[in-house]
């Protein structure tokens, strides 16, 4: 949140902050910023849709409905702003690794990003462009969303999710079993 707030001091900074908000709230790959659309269910519920299809050795990922996971309840009204054409984004090139590279280059010149990277490095952790996407996975699991649902929301298979987004630790395993035991006592 501090990083996003720090960027919002200029028009260009606002556009980049909007991109980071989308990456974080919807768990997007950077390139997916160029493939967003608003759609509507038959019952009239509007949602953000990603038409991107990632090619891999396992085939193509499917376009998908995006599920927001706000940070501390803050969703920045991204869907309504996007639909109204009021969510300005930087000009992004979807060629190759262009979007991720553009975001990386922009952030590497920002003092808030440099400071945040140093704090993360002091904990022997890494901070990169995909950290916004990774935080989506962590928030989802902490909220009790199962791995299969998180994988589907993020546009990859359960196998990929489990290998690339290992969430389970001794602490999370203990919490999961504590919750299960508490549920069985209630029912």
Language-model regions, residue ranges each:
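Active-site/catalytic core of tyrosine-dependent DNA strand-transfer enzymes
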Residues: 68-132, 136
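Intrinsically disordered, low-complexity basic tails/linkers immediately adjacent to helix-turn-helix/homeobox/MYB/SANT
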Residues: 179-187
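Short, polar N-cap/turn motifs at the start of nucleic acid-interacting alpha helices
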Residues: 39-47, 145-164
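Conserved tyrosine-mediated DNA breakage-rejoining catalytic core shared by Y-recombinases
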Residues: 35-77
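Catalytic-site neighborhood detector that most strongly recognizes the C-terminal catalytic loop/helix
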Residues: 52-56, 154-179
